Regions:
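Kelch-like beta-propeller repeat domains
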Residues: 18-328
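Gram-negative bacterial Sec-dependent N-terminal signal peptides
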Residues: 1-18
């Protein structure tokens, strides 16, 4: 059994399976990525820098083991997936050779047998940050995420502004004061075939792209839960991708974390029920946006949800709370 997860779902999966039996991560872990191959969990990047670790959840002596360092430099918001015994890492946010923050669209492959990395000669047709990745029928699928040109341009402007607070305020106002559709978040579904290292168009959402959604995949169905609709504005939407019969259908389920929604939440499956927990957002931002304020989160404080929601029998129910609000 191969599963695709993000760093966000590792905590949720551990929570559902009784997290007390697993050792703490080797370093405080945030904004990284991870994947499960059979019973072994792999995590890396984010606050771990270029480090990667693995944990055999069935071992008698459960402990994290350090792996070869990632060759592409420290990155946040990369995603990863196991396919045919190899780990693939997609995109992320990091520093380029000039020291500027940018979105990457590259792919790296890790071979557990040789404990080695290789950068593939393959680039997605768009940047990959805030995106989600899942596996279906031997291919990796990617959707969502920020627009590479807009995001990179924002950080180029901030770099040029230096410590000029007036210029920075002007840049932020210009960046955040737009409608959601003007950020061009990715609503395309892309497929990556590891046998050819080629990217292909696989469809697109009939609604809109999100960034920082939680993703859950089981069989022919994948769920995208909440996320950003634009910088600072979340959505409470839940999308379902159904591959049944090799005919991709997009469905919209009942919302959760209403009315403002969250980004960077945790999600997983337990006893055939979909679980969604945590996430961060700005209370009041949705109302501001609906009232015509594009810079919807201006002046609002980011809050972290502790709520645990369960999707069962066609509806969401609050089933408990995390020990504290958390996200990413």
């Amino acid at each position: 059994m191969n599963k695709t997860i993000t760093a966000l779902t590792i905590i949720m999966a551990s929570f559902a399976a009784n997290a007390s039996v697993l050792p703490e991560t080797p370093v405080p872990f945030k904004s990284g990525t991870g994947a499960i191959d059979n019973d072994t969990v792999y995590i890396g990047l984010g606050s771990a820098g270029t480090a990667w670790y693995k944990l055999d959840t069935q071992a008698k002596d459960k402990k994290w083991t350090a792996l070869a360092a990632f060759p592409g430099g420290p990155r946040d918001q990369a995603t990863s997936a196991f396919i045919d015994g190899n780990l693939y890492v997609f995109g992320g946010i990091g520093k380029n050779s000039e020291g500027l923050t940018q979105v990457f669209n590259d792919v790296h492959k890790y071979n557990p047998k040789t404990n080695s990395w290789v950068k593939l000669i393959s680039h997605a047709p768009m940047g990959m940050a805030g995106h989600v990745t899942f596996v279906h029928n031997g291919k990796a699928y990617v959707t969502g995420g920020v627009n590479q040109n807009i995001f990179n341009g924002y950080f180029e402007d901030l770099n040029e502004a230096g410590k000029d607070s007036t210029a920075i305020d002007k840049i932020n106002a210009h960046y955040f004061d737009k409608k959601a559709e003007d950020y061009f978040f990715n609503k395309f579904l892309l497929s990556f075939d590891p046998s050819t290292q080629q990217w292909s168009y696989a469809g697109e959402s009939p609604w809109y792209g999100t960034a920082g959604a939680a993703v859950v995949n089981k069989g022919d169905k994948t769920w995208l839960i909440n996320g950003e609709a634009k910088p600072g504005l979340r959505t409470d939407a839940v999308f379902e991708l159904d591959f049944t019969g090799n005919n991709l259908k997009w469905n919209k389920l009942a919302p959760v974390s209403s009315p403002d929604g969250v980004a960077g939440g945790f999600a997983g499956i337990s006893n055939d029920s979909l679980i969604f927990a945590g996430g961060a957002g700005f209370k009041g931002s949705r109302e501001n946006y609906q009232n015509g304020k594009n810079y919807a989160h201006e002046g609002l404080k980011k809050s972290y949800s502790a709520d645990i929601h369960l999707w069962h029998n066609g509806k969401w129910d609050k089933s408990g709370e995390l020990s504290q609000g958390r996200a990413y």
